[in-house]
Amino acid sequence: MSQVESMLYAEAPHVTSGQGGASRTSLMQRVAICFAAGAVGGLAVVLFSHLLFALGVSAAFGVTAPVPLKSPDVYRPLFWAGLWGIPFGLLIKPVWSRLYLAGLLYFLAPVLALFTIFLPLSGAGLFGLQHGGPTFTAYLVLVNLPFGITTALVARAIIGKNP
């Protein structure tokens, strides 16, 4: 076998590490992992909205119903959350030593986009103030809190000790 063939067909090192491994992941692997982790983070937000609704907290903020759990309504927030996991995958290596803090704060990125782009485009105004006033804005911050930390927890569980 020539040197080129041996390089082409050489067994690639194991790069995903789970809980205990010390291997490193590539950028594409981190992005893919964080897409999946973001989707799980989105599921946490949807389930948290149902919890807040069941506890009566949503009504105090003027929200009348949580995100439906039936198809196809549930897929949109999961897909968008997965997309928001991609930038987290790009940032995960430099913030690895403070991953959970970064995850906790990362929920602000999609919330800021929601407040300044998506809500105004939907007619709810900047920060959703035309839809329900400041209480609606506060509710959106509250309901989205689980996104970043859940994304970080899931990414850490899949990647292991070293990104």
Label for each model-derived stretch:
Residues 2-163:
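Juxtamembrane/disordered regions of integral membrane proteins
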